[in-house]
């Protein structure tokens, strides 16, 4: 009852004749809640990211600043999360890696500037040789309330 699939090498498709299986799903192909999602009794707004510079060398650092505002009616705490994506690495890298987070408690209507410092240490990854190193190139950073944020900026690491 096993048929060999064309073009898949040693992969086999199992075809059970006593069951019906549809491969069509009419649901979104995404998690119900993104990583870092949290409930709150109030709402928050996060400004666009402002970088103090658009490039750094291996001994430097970049400061990424956002303003978070409590737009609700209750005092609340928001966890801002910093994700980094290496656009073109020599090995496959995650789409977004959580590198830092900061908790901010705000009263209704209050806003606060939050600064994340990015160093080469946060850009290191394990190479095929088993060594942690960074590579020159372009990086994207995302700052928001969870991993699905579209709030991004980019910078270049020069070596």
Map each language-model feature to its residues.
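Single conserved hydrophobic/aromatic residue that forms the stacking wall/gate
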Residues: 1-12
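Intrinsically disordered, low-complexity Ser/Thr/Gly-rich stretches
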Residues: 10-159
């Amino acid at each position: 009852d096993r048929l060999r699939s064309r073009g898949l090498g040693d992969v086999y498709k199992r075809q059970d004749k006593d069951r019906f299986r549809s491969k069509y799903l009419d649901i979104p192909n995404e998690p119900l809640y993104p990583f870092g999602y949290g409930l709150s009794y109030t709402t928050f707004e996060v400004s666009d990211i402002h970088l103090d510079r658009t490039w750094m060398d291996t001994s430097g650092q970049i400061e990424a600043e956002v303003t978070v505002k409590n737009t609700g009616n209750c005092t609340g705490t928001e966890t801002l999360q910093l994700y980094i994506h290496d656009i073109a690495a020599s090995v496959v890298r995650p789409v977004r890696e959580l590198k830092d987070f900061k908790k901010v408690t705000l009263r209704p209507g209050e806003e606060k500037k939050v600064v994340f410092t990015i160093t080469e240490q946060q850009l290191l990854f394990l190479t095929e040789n088993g060594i942690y190193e960074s590579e020159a190139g372009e990086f994207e950073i995302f700052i928001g309330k969870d991993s699905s944020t579209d709030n991004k900026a980019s910078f270049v690491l020069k070596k």
